[in-house]
Every structure is written in C-alpha cells, then in structure tokens.
Amino acid sequence: KSMALWFALDRWEDMKSHIDGEYDYMIINRYVLSNAVYQSIRDIDLQRPDIIDWVFDLEYGHFCLPRADIYLFYDVAPAQAGENVMKKGFRDYVGGEKKDVYEESCGIQQRARAKYLETAQRRGDVAVIQCMGDEGMRSIEDIGAETMRVLRERNMI
C-alpha cells in the first residue's frame, strides 16, 4: 500500500492546481486506474486481497482527485508492447535504459493486462480499445477511429 500512497501523493501534488471546470476535456496518461492495477499485481502482494478498491478510495475519497469519466485501456499483446517500448526515444525516468522495471518483466506485463481486462469487466468506467488485429498492431487511424466511437457511444464527445 505504501507504493500506492506515493503515487497518489505525487498525483495529488500535480493536480492540486487544477480548477474543476477549467477545461472541457482533460486527457491524463496513467491515472488512478494505472496505480490500482500495478499495485495489485506486484509479486509481493499476489497472496493478499485485491487493493484496487482501496486505491480508488485513497485517490478519489481521501485526496479528492478529479474523477475520470472514462478510462481507456489500449489492449496490446505484451510481446508487441515490449517491441513498442524499444522504439521509444530517451526517457529520463529510466536512467537511459530502454525499459523501466515494469516493462522489463513479461510476467508483470501479462498480469497487468489480465488485471486491466478483469477490471474493465467489473467497472463501467473502463473501455477496452483493441489495438491488435489478425496481422499485428492495427493502424493508428483504426485505433483512433475506435477511440472516437467509444467516446461517442458514451456521450463524451
């Protein structure tokens, strides 16, 4: 739980200057759902009860972070995700390495994907965008069109 708290505090620090209603839309990468999923699949916590609901209560209830209207989970096969990471440019938070500690482990990637899909089944605010087709990654245009379709279906745009 301590890792979840650190991520929540970091997010709270970044968001405390946000004024509700200031923008029509806010698109945030790796928000509360990401913290909840990754904390729930850590090796050390696999035998403990799922902490996803605890993380949501911490970030939304205690820190009063703005609630996401929708979470978009872009579903990519872990092997393809690993290939995509290798194409990224320099990222200072990985200290010059190509992958961070979570990206390095195929097991973590597989558990995270499974937990995102499970969570999408349990919660109405998570939409799964399929990024893989029969022949690998779908095109950016196809993925973008599906994203727009999901947002329209949910009256987000």
Predicted features along the sequence, with ranges:
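ATP-dependent small-molecule kinase phosphotransfer cores
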Residues: 1-63
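Conserved catalytic core of Hanks-type protein kinase domains
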Residues: 9, 30, 74-75, 84, ...
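Structured loop/turn residues at beta-strand edges in well-structured enzyme cores
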Residues: 21, 66, 124
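Short beta-strand segments at enzyme active-site cores
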Residues: 27-29, 74, 127-130
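A glycine- and Lys/Arg-enriched "phosphate-lid" helix/loop adjacent to the NTP-binding pocket
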Residues: 35-114
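NTP-dependent small-molecule kinase module
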Residues: 79-157
